Every structure is written in C-alpha cells, then in structure tokens.
Design a protein with these regions (language model features):
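Alpha-helical nucleic-acid-binding subdomain
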Residues: 1-198
Length: 199
C-alpha cells in the first residue's frame, strides 16, 4: 500500500476524494506557481503554524455548559476541570468523549444499572455538541484562511476533494486532534529513495 493510499483511507470520513502525487505533478506542469505553494505547505514553518492553530482551538472551539441527565448533573465548572486538567493528555476532539464516559460512569453508579446504547448515545451527543465543529476539513479551511491562503470550498463530504498539497496537513491535523486507531496491520514501512517524505 502506498502512503497516498494510506492517507486516502484515513481521510475517507472527512473528504470524498484526495489527489495523489501524479495529479500534483500534472498541475505543476500546467502551472509552475503551484510548486511554491506545495513547498510552503510541506515546510516545518507551516507545521509550526498548524500547531499554533491547534493550541488556539483549545479555547476557540469549546462552548461549555452544564449537563443534566435523569437527575444527575455535571456543572460547567466540573466539565472545564475535567476537560483541561484530568483529560489533558487526550487529543482535543476526543477529549469530550472521555468527559462523557466519566459522567456516564457517575450516572450508572447512581442509578445502579448500565445505560442502554441509546441512552449512552444521547449523553454523548450532549457532550459532543459543546464543540463548535469536529470537522477537520472545516478547521483546516479556517486555518488556511487565517494564514492568507484560499480556503477550501464549502460542500458536502462526498463532494470534497483535497489537493495533494493539502492531504498531508489534513492528515496531520486529524492525528493531532483525534485519538486515532492503531495500525497493527502495518508490519513494515519501506521508503523508496525516489519519494522524499522529509522536510
């Protein structure tokens, strides 16, 4: 499996399609200025800006409020403490899931029974709704706009198509913001000397 195919599989829940390296080569032949933008988006400076953007999201993305479910309440202050202190090691867009699990454990203990899947989902949705958005495509588009680049087009997931120079920054953003699954199926990584994945 190529790294481009790996990236496509990892991003299929965010975008409908991703360009591959051959698409980028074709674009740069037709418009050499694209090569400069590609180099910029693959630079350490661009990654540093993306990291700074992620840090600012900790405050900008959240809309905390009390949660009440069947007589059990978790106050806004308690949620903030859990979010910023107890579960700080959990990536930002997965962190509220940990807070919700904590609350669900409290509810189950007080009610002396497990919540059904539907009840758990209802509680999870209360906590997920505290994020302004959880969509990496939207967040990356916002980042591009703040940095002076053209934002990504607003469209439904199936119609989204990432240019090659944006595929790896979005993948990086996803792995930074979400608790991603392990890839136990990957046993070896072979880097062809013709492919340069370094900065």
């Amino acid at each position: 499996m190529s790294f481009d195919l790996f990236a496509y599989r990892e991003l299929k829940d965010i975008v409908g399609d991703c360009e591959d390296r051959y698409d980028q080569i074709e674009h740069t032949v037709l418009n050499p200025k694209i090569q400069d933008i590609c180099r910029e988006k693959q630079s350490p400076e661009f990654v540093s800006k993306l990291d700074g953007f992620v840090l600012r999201l900790e405050d900008e993305l959240m809309n905390f409020r009390d949660v009440e479910y069947r007589g059990c309440t978790l106050s806004e202050k308690e949620i903030i403490d859990l979010f910023y202190f107890k579960f700080l090691d959990v990536p930002l867009l997965s962190r509220m899931h940990s807070v919700a699990e904590y609350f669900i454990d409290q509810v189950e203990t007080l009610r002396d029974r497990d919540l059904s899947d539907e009840e758990r989902e209802e509680v999870m949705e209360c906590f997920r709704s505290m994020y302004e958005t959880r969509d990496c495509y939207v967040l990356y588009s916002r980042f591009l706009e703040k940095e002076g680049y053209r934002p990504l087009p607003h469209c439904q997931i199936e119609k989204r198509r990432l240019r090659y120079e944006d595929v790896y920054p979005v993948l990086y953003l996803k792995y930074t913001l979400y608790q991603c699954r392990n890839h136990h199926g990957i046993k070896h990584v072979v880097v062809d000397e013709m492919q340069d994945y370094s900065w």
